[in-house]
């Protein structure tokens, strides 16, 4: 006869359950989910629990959880709500024994069973907990990543019921997907906090090192100011027949655009690319070619866009100093303007406005009465001159020293003005600034002593000091003529121009714009050769700054100088003299603010060494009062 089932509460059944639990405790180190089981037991608070021979909570905890398999959905039995406790997980349905499905109630109820266990149960669980803590001290939890196992880990049938399709084969699992308890998360956060603390310490060390090395950076930056790019940027030859090309794609290649324009319309002489505004200016040899090119290039397909083209306007009225690289042709050239342009290194002071001024020969009609011209030879109380500076740094240095030096061809006019007039006012402007820097009064004659000469333009742009434009030749093809790329990246200029005819050398005597650009090219070449005229020396004289308040060119719109072909005052060269009434009107736009802030009196025993190496007194020349803020 088979053994009859034992009545409830018998000691034999309790002994059988205890033996099964002892076997399970000895084998739990090989159990794939031992760490999670021990963690669950550690996290259980002491509370109300049920103990008895039919308590299957311990067996239920040994079953695998659906979250240990990828893609497994959590299942809730008997309509129980999903688990909201981070420590307790819903138990899956097991097959093979109906007693496992006869436990109603939420899963949280069965997690609190530790308090009601017999002493021998509790001792074995404490032993497993200690082993689990030893494993947690290592780099990773025991058997935390099931993806390390090629085959599923199996246990004896006395501990696991046969599983159906509810638990598929193991697959690749996401990292840290098995550890849902707070202990691995806390351990991970400890490592993160440790790395974050190290990073903060490293950042603080970097800040300290930066503060210590800051004076060296400032010193290097101060030394690099001596290699300032001087002079205006190079510009292509201006034929007076130009079109504007817009809607260029970003980062347009210059030669790709030149090839496209030459293919669509022949007769291109130069193309100036403005990358910042995605546009370009193209010069053509005559008006007919210019009009034809505008019609063909407009709405033409370039790469992936449609280009927009317009004819260039034939006037420079209303310009604010930042003019386009192309301009209208000269209808009545002025010979006196072209004669002022010297073919030496001093021609680098020609500004953008100067080149446009040389082509704008036909002055617009003046609706208001023109100012009465004063005879320059007649004695005058006041004289006004426009002086150009290569850089703003030279002007700021002059504020500190009260010394200025001009070009040689201006010295005679300034000396004569100082002798005949009561006051000589000098209005300063830096190249490419689009504004007046300020104005000062001449307080001494120009020192004719050769020993006092200073090098106000150090070595006249020697190739070793500044970056000069790079000329890159280009070969001709079926559409494009032979030419060259002028890359002046230091000044933000790049353009292409066709080579001029060999018989004319690219200079037309009747085109003052072309002559000015040609002279500018000669000056750059003379700087490269480093000939005897490469050093530009100036003789110093004393000035008293009256205002360093900046005056933009647009504020002087409408003020014209009768002594400069009635052009606007902003269109002037270095040394241009203003008609006295115009000079008074222009200086009246300045204010006296800013002189006291920028003016710094040097120590009486301190001497400045000028560019030519000649020691100059730091203060004023003996016999002249020091400068004061007006």
From Swiss-Prot:
Keyword Transit peptide: no
Biased composition (Polar residues): 70-102
Xref: SMART domains: RRM
Domain annotation YTH: ranges: 382-590
Disruption phenotype: Does not seem to affect growth nor conidiation. Displays milder disease lesions on rice leaves.
Region (Disordered): 38-113, 160-183, 200-241
UniProtKB keywords: Cytoplasm
Major subcellular site: cytoplasm
Location of this chain's protein in the cell: Cytoplasm, P-body
Family, similarity comment: Belongs to the YTHDF family. YTHDF1 subfamily.
Role, per record: Specifically recognizes and binds N6-methyladenosine (m6A)-containing mRNAs, and regulates their stability. M6A is a modification present at internal sites of mRNAs and some non-coding RNAs and plays a role in mRNA stability and processing. Plays a role in pathogenicity towards plant host.
Xref: PANTHER family: YTH DOMAIN-CONTAINING PROTEIN 1, YTH YT521-B HOMOLOGY DOMAIN-CONTAINING
Protein name listed in UniProt: YTH domain-containing family protein 1
Organism encoding this protein: Pyricularia oryzae (strain 70-15 / ATCC MYA-4617 / FGSC 8958) (Rice blast fungus)
High-level lineage: Eukaryota, Fungi, Dikarya, Ascomycota, Pezizomycotina
Gene assigned in the entry: YTH1
